[in-house]
């Protein structure tokens, strides 16, 4: 499977789906591609941030990292932005694309989200990730990262130049993952989750979904059931 992760700034991809990418890269049949549109010059030295981004891609085990030269904080939904994203979509031939949420508060993120939807019109699956400061986010997909949450924190720590930002601290990363795990109500053994919004989701023939066995119903519950249950069966 080819996976393309798109981000506006160094550390966006890692915050949004770093755990998923770490797990995917450990499996031989997954190819990770990363496309970053700016070098983050509005929040630090762009050369230093570029070096951090390269170290991050190596840590993840990405097959390719592409770094563009759009100006930080100046992105807008335009044909130029759409064309650039479409070029790297065609270059990576992804089965799934991860990008920013259309409801994000940062205008760079919103521009990329909209451009990805247009550029990815022939991509079967597009999911939008969140970062700890994303607000209007309504997840429908949850991915278990319990076994790599420490690795994700180590990944985020690569961005040393941004260490002063509270949402990059380990308690913010772990706290969001724990909150999404509780929200998903999967299973008490799952302690860390990355959540995603669905922009496009195409199921193939296998239609494999994660399932946990339901808890057994106690006998006392049956005392509260009605005396007669009529079950309708189609003929």
Predicted regions and their residues:
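Divalent metal-coordination and catalytic microenvironments
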Residues: 11, 38, 53, 65, ...
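Alpha-helical elements of Rossmann-like donor-binding domains used by nucleotide-donor carbohydrate transfer enzymes
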Residues: 19-20, 52-55, 80-84, 111, ...
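Structural signal for conserved beta-strand scaffold positions within catalytic alpha/beta enzyme cores
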Residues: 36, 66-69, 128, 142-144, ...
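Flexible loop residues that form catalytic
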Residues: 40, 70, 102, 131, ...
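Active-site adenylate/phosphate-handling loop in enzymes that bind or generate adenylated species
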Residues: 88-133
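The feature marks non-catalytic terminal segments
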Residues: 134-235
């Amino acid at each position: 499977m080819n996976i393309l992760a798109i981000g506006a700034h160094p550390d966006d991809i890692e915050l949004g789906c770093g755990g998923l990418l770490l797990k995917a890269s450990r499996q031989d049949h997954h190819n990770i591609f990363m496309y970053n549109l700016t070098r983050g010059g509005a929040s630090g030295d762009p050369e230093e941030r570029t070096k951090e981004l390269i170290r991050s891609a190596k840590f993840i085990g990405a097959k390719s990292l592409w770094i563009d030269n759009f100006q930080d904080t100046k992105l807008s939904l335009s044909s130029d932005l759409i064309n650039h994203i479409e070029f790297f979509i065609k270059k990576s031939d992804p089965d799934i694309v991860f990008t920013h949420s259309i409801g994000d508060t940062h205008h760079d993120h919103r521009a990329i989200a909209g451009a990805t939807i247009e550029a990815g019109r022939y991509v079967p699956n597009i999911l939008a990730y969140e970062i700890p400061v994303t607000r209007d986010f309504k997840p429908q997909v949850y991915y278990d990262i319990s076994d790599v949450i420490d690795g994700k924190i180590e990944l985020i720590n690569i961005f040393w130049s941004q260490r002063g930002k509270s949402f990059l601290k380990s308690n913010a990363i772990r706290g969001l993952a724990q909150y999404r795990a509780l929200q998903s109500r999967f299973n008490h053994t799952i302690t860390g989750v990355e959540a995603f919004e669905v922009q496009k989701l195409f199921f193939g023939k296998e239609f494999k979904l994660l399932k946990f066995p339901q808890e057994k119903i106690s006998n006392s519950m049956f005392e509260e059931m009605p005396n007669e249950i009529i079950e309708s069966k189609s003929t």
